[in-house]
């Protein structure tokens, strides 16, 4: 007899790059453990892979972290982390003037938004004949 599958709460958000409405869930203990192991390793690639796997799992496979723009992955990760661990993060900001003084600050992850200008385009017109089309940076770039 198989173990029962526990339901997790689901939430919706608007994907910054496409405006698509997407469902996601908080991460589970096993996924949090993957993040902790990656963090302890200190390897950038392992951290990026763990973050990508977490986003893939928590969006029910709707977002492919290998092909989605980095800003989408970061935005999703912050939203998932907020619903999983808590929306408020305590930070110690270092003063830019002396580089030593720290100021405590509490950031609400729900307030973090991806800003896109109205005239934003990934195309740059060099002259009448030449136009360059860029792609957004990816997680493993």
Give the ranges of each region predicted by the language model:
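Long C-terminal interaction/binding lobes of large macromolecular proteins
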Residues: 1-141
